[in-house]
Amino acid sequence: QMCIRDSQDPVEEEQIPDSLERYESILVEEQLKEVKRKRDTMIAIREYVVEKTSKYLSKENISTLFRNIECIAENRVNDCQPIHSTKEAKISSPSLRHLAWNIGERLGVSRRDRAIFIKSSFPYELRNADIEYLEANLRVNVPCDIPIDVPDKGDFHFHNIT
C-alpha cells in the first residue's frame, strides 16, 4: 500500500510506525488491571465484613454473606440466600443498612440493589422494613455498630478497620 505525505513523496506504509501496534496489548493490560481491581475490592470487602460482623454472625453465616456479596457484584441480587444471626448479639437495622451502603458503594451498585441485597440476606432482622424504606434509609446516619464509611474518591478501601 502507498500513502502520500505532505511533500507528496510516496512512502510505503510499513516505514511509518504503526500507532495501533500496541492496541491489543493496551486493551489486555486494561482488562488485567480491571480484574485485579475487582479482586482487590472483593478482598477488602471480605476483610471488612469479617471485622464488622463476626460478633453477630457464625462463620457459616459470614460465608453465606460472602456468596450474597458475589451475587450483588455479579448483578444477581435475586439469588441472595437468607441469613439469620444465631448469636446472642443481634445486628441492628441501621448497622445492616450501613453495611449494605458501604459494600454497595465499593461495588458501584444501585441503592435499590443494595436494599434488595440486605433485605434478602437478613429477612428476619429486617422483617419490619420493606425495600422502599431500606432504599431510602441506607445512608441515614444514626448511631450504631457499623457506621457509614464513605470511600475516598476512586478508592475501594475501608477506613477504621484493624
Where are these regions (language model features)?
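Flexible coil/loop and intrinsically disordered linker positions at secondary-structure junctions
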Residues: 7-162
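Short, small-residue-biased leader/transition segments that mark boundaries at the very start
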Residues: 2-4
